[in-house]
Amino acid sequence: MQYVLIIHEVESYPAWKAIFDQAVDIRKSAGEISYQLLRYDNDANNIVHFSARSSLDNARRFFESPELVEIRKKAGVKAPDFIYLQEIERDVL
């Protein structure tokens, strides 16, 4: 499985979340299979978006696209960090 981990600060979580939810169709078409949203325990505006992806190449194209850059601006995202990951092992304890 392939994943993308995005860490970013947002101006306002509720405003960001509304735009995130509106983008569900373009996220799906870019290969997002599932996601988790997390936040720092001491700052609700520091968000971690962890998603399973069908293709890291498609994910890179999507996250670097002018359309998504504009969406991030509207959502109040500040300097996102993208980490592209390949699963090497999974287990349940």
Regions found by a protein language model. Name each.
Residues 2, 30-48, 70-93:
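Glycine-rich beta-strand-turn "strand-cap" elements at beta-sheet edges
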Residues 2-9, 36-65:
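Short, well-ordered beta-strand segments in beta-rich or mixed alpha/beta enzyme
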Residues 4, 9, 16, 31, ...:
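A general marker of short, structured functional hotspots
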Residues 12-35, 67-70:
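Short amphipathic alpha-helical segments
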Residues 21, 63-64, 83:
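Compositionally biased, low-structure terminal segments
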